[in-house]
Amino acid sequence: MASLRLAAGALEEPAAAAAMPLSASLPSKNYDYDYDSVQPYFYFEEEEENFYLAAQQRGSELQPPAPSEDIWKKFELLPTPPLSPSRRSSLAAASCFPSTADQLEMVTELLGGDMVNQSFICDPDDESFVKSIIIQDCMWSGFSAAAKLEKVVSEKLATYQASRREGGPAAASRPGPPPSGPPPPPAGPAASAGLYLHDLGAAAADCIDPSVVFPYPLSERAPRAAPPGANPAALLGVDTPPTTSSDSEEEQEEDEEIDVVTLAEANESESSTESSTEASEEHCKPHHSPLVLKRCHVNIHQHNYAAPPSTKVEYPAAKRLKLDSGRVLKQISNNRKCSSPRTSDSEENDKRRTHNVLERQRRNELKLSFFALRDQIPEVANNEKAPKVVILKKATEYVLSIQSDEHRLIAEKEQLRRRREQLKHKLEQLRNSRA
C-alpha cells in the first residue's frame, strides 16, 4: 500500500498530461499506459535479471523522468516484489483491456478513498473483482518472499514475457481461420468492461489454495470442506501468490501430499491430547477400589518343621508350582499390608489380609507335614494322589503295627535275658563241682 501510494504521488506531476479518469465512458486506449514503464522506480535489478526489459524495448510508451534516483536510499525502504504474471494469456496482446498495473492502481485508489466511479470497477452483482486483483498480487501477501517462491515467480514471469513477445507478432501475421473458442467481444467500453470482469472471474477461479503457500496449518482447527457449488473466488484468501495452470496442477499435487501429513499430525496431536486428558482425569478421580495386585517373584525359604532335618524331599512340578504361588501370594499380601493407608477401613483390611496370610501359611505347613508322613508309610509312599484320610489311616495302622512289633521284641528280649541268667547259673555249678 505504501509503495503504491508513493508511486502514485511520484507519477501525479510527471504524468499529468497522461492522467486518466476512471470512468465507464473512458475509451480503452487510455489504459495502454503500462505499469512496466515505471518499474525502475520501484525495483532496481541488474540488466540480466530485469524481466521487465521487454516492456521497455517496445518503445510504445515514453518513460517520464524519475522523481529521484536514490529514492530507496533516501527513505531506506525495501523494493516492492516483482509484478505477478497475468492470467489472461489469450488476451495479453489485446490493447483494448487494462493491464495488471492499471488494475493495481485502480484498487489502490479505490482503497485509498479516491473519488472513483465504482460502477466501472465492478458490477453490483460481481463482488469477486477486488478479491481477484488482490489474490493475483504478491505484495498483498502476509508472508516474507522465500527463495523458492521468488524462483518460481521469476521463472514463470520470464516464460510469460517470452511467450508474450513471440505470441504478439505470430498472431498478427498468421491469417488462419478464426478460433473455435468463444466469439470476440464487441467493441465499446461497456463490452470491454464486461469481458474484463468475466476474465477476472476466470482468473480468480484458477487461483491456487492458500494451503499450498502455507504447507503447515496456521491454527489447530481442521480446514472445512468447501461445498460443491461454492464460488472459488470466495473461498480463497487474499494472501495467495499467483501461478499458471500447469504450476497450479503441480502445487495441487504437492498440496495433497502435504495435507495427508498435516492431517496425520493433527490426528496424532488430537489423539495424544485426548489420551493425556483421559490420563489426567483418571489421576484426578479418587481411588475407591482396592489396590492392584503386583506380581513379585521373591524366593521365600520356609523350613519344614515336621520333616527330618537331614531328609531332602523333592516334590513334583505341579506341587512346586502350587507352593510357589502360595509364597507369591504371601509376599503380595505383605506388600499390600505395608502400602495400605492407616484408616479404619484399611486396618480392617489389614487384619483380614494378615489372617488370610497366616491361614495360608498354616495350610501349607500342614500339607508339607502330610507329604512327609506319606513318605514314611510304605504302603502310600509312592502314591502321589493319596488323600489325607488314607494317609492318616495307613499311618495309624503302621504305628500300631510298629507298636506290636515293639512289644514282641521286648518279650523276646526278656526271654533271652532269662535264658542267659539260667545258663550263667548252670555254668557256675559245673565249675564248683570240679573243684
From Swiss-Prot:
Molecular function GO terms recorded: core promoter sequence-specific DNA binding; DNA-binding transcription activator activity, RNA polymerase II-specific; DNA-binding transcription factor activity, RNA polymerase II-specific; DNA-binding transcription factor binding; DNA-binding transcription repressor activity, RNA polymerase II-specific; E-box binding; identical protein binding; protein dimerization activity
SUPFAM superfamilies linked to this entry: HLH, helix-loop-helix DNA-binding domain (SSF47459)
Region (Leucine-zipper): 409-430
Chain residue ranges for the region called Disordered: 163-193, 222-286, 335-359
Chief location category: nucleus
Pro residues composition-biased segments: 175-188
A Pfam family this chain is assigned to: HLH
Compositionally biased region (Low complexity): 231-246, 264-278
Every bHLH domain range: 350-402
Biological processes annotated in GO: cellular response to hypoxia; cellular response to UV; cellular response to xenobiotic stimulus; chromosome organization; DNA damage response; epidermis morphogenesis; ERK1 and ERK2 cascade; G1/S transition of mitotic cell cycle
PROSITE patterns linked to this entry: BHLH (PS50888)
Ribonucleoprotein as UniProt keyword: no
Glycosylation-annotated residues: T80
UniProt-listed SMART domains: HLH (SM00353)
Subcellular localization: Nucleus
GO cellular component: chromatin; Myc-Max complex; nucleolus; nucleoplasm; RNA polymerase II transcription repressor complex
Extent of Acidic residues compositional bias: 247-259
Keyword terms: Activator, DNA-binding, Glycoprotein, Nucleus, Phosphoprotein, Proto-oncogene, Transcription, Transcription regulation
Motif 9aaTAD per UniProt: ranges: 105-113
Function of the molecule: Transcription factor that binds DNA in a non-specific manner, yet also specifically recognizes the core sequence 5'-CAC[GA]TG-3'. Activates the transcription of growth-related genes.
UniProt cross-references to PANTHER family, sorted A to Z: MYC PROTO-ONCOGENE (PTHR45851)
Quaternary data: Efficient DNA binding requires dimerization with another bHLH protein. Binds DNA as a heterodimer with MAX.
Record's miscellaneous remark: Alternative translation initiation from an upstream, in-frame non-ATG (ATT) codon or a downstream ATG start site results in the production of 2 isoforms with distinct N-termini, shown in this entry as isoform 2 and isoform 1, respectively.
Domain remarks: The 9aaTAD motif is a transactivation domain present in a large number of yeast and animal transcription factors.
Protein name: Myc proto-oncogene protein
